[in-house]
Regions:
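N-terminal accessory segments
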Residues: 1-35, 41, 60-68
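N-terminal glycine-rich flavin-associated loop
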Residues: 13, 36-68, 86, 90-133, ...
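Active-site beta-loop-alpha junctions enriched in small/polar residues
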Residues: 26, 134-136
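Short glycine-biased active-site loop of nucleotidyltransferases that positions the nucleotide triphosphate
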Residues: 35-36, 77-82
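Conserved PLP cofactor-binding pocket of PLP-dependent enzymes
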Residues: 71
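Beta-rich nucleic-acid/ligand-interaction surfaces
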Residues: 138-142
């Protein structure tokens, strides 16, 4: 049984997004925290199946006047992944390497790919991504870019800029 009657925002998102559209208290509670001490209940969560759905969710949230936060692994220690608007979680479906150019040492990835997973795939080609956050088994590239993450190798290899 639903926690409450669906809002117009929830109804529209559910109609236009095939990925998960979460407005129940349990799901919202899971997204109300990250690795920080902040706890902010979001209005809703969207887990898009592809980038078109992510863009659609963003447009719907904008039409409704909601703030939006992109979320990956939720490993932020400063509360960047929590808000009282709409959270778009990229970690479930948008987590692949889209292209890899070994010769030029470049790749294009989706925002939800986990750093350790990326490096496992790059290692097969003698490559690696040198930003070494302590949460590499859970941190996503999108979240790392949003935070300008760095690590012990940042003096030599730089940050996410």
């Amino acid at each position: 049984m639903p926690d409450h009657a669906p809002s117009p925002l929830q109804t529209r998102l559910a109609k236009e997004i095939t990925g998960d559209v979460l407005f129940d208290r349990f799901s919202l509670g899971r997204y109300a925290t990250d690795a920080s001490f902040y706890q902010i209940m979001p209005a809703g969560v969207v887990v898009p199946r592809n980038m078109d759905e992510a863009l659609r969710a963003l447009a719907i949230a904008r039409d409704d006047g909601r703030i939006v936060t992109a979320r990956g692994g939720g490993t932020s220690q400063c509360g960047q992944t929590v808000n009282n608007g709409i959270v778009i979680d990229f970690s479930k479906h948008l987590n692949r390497i889209l292209s890899l150019d070994v010769e030029n040492r470049t790749c294009v990835v989706e925002p939800g790919i986990v750093l350790d997973d990326l490096n496992r795939q790059l290692k097969k080609h003698g490559l690696w991504f040198p930003v070494d956050v302590s949460t590499a088994s859970r941190a996503t590239i999108g979240g790392m870019a949003g935070n300008n993450s760095c690590g012990g190798r940042s003096l030599r290899y730089g940050t996410m800029r």
